[in-house]
C-alpha cells in the first residue's frame, strides 16, 4: 500500500504546491 500512497502523494503534491503559490501572490 505504501507504493500506491506514494503515487497518490506525487500526484497531489504539484496541485497543493500550485495552490500554495497562488495564495502567496
Swiss-Prot record:
Coiled-coil spans are none
For this UniProt record, give its keywords in alphabetical order, as a comma-separated list. Antibiotic, Antimicrobial, Cytolysis, Fungicide, Hemolysis, Membrane, Secreted, Target cell membrane, Target membrane, Toxin
Say yes or no: keyword Thylakoid present: no
Keyword Secreted listed: yes
Q: Which GO terms describe its molecular function?
A: toxin activity
What does UniProt note about where in the body, tissue by tissue, this protein is expressed?
Expressed by the venom gland.
Q: What domain of life does the UniProt record list for this protein's source?
A: Eukaryota
User: What's any GO biological process attached to this entry?
Assistant: killing of cells of another organism
Cellular compartments annotated: Secreted; Target cell membrane
Signal peptide (from-to): none
Q: What is its main location?
A: secreted
Q: Name one GO cellular component term.
A: other organism cell membrane
The entry sums up its family as follows: Belongs to the non-disulfide-bridged peptide (NDBP) superfamily. Medium-length antimicrobial peptide (group 3) family. Ponericin-W subfamily.
- State what this protein does: Has a broad spectrum of activity against both Gram-positive and Gram-negative bacteria and S.cerevisiae. Has insecticidal and hemolytic activities. May act by disrupting the integrity of the bacterial cell membrane.
Protein name as it appears in the record: M-poneritoxin-Ng1a
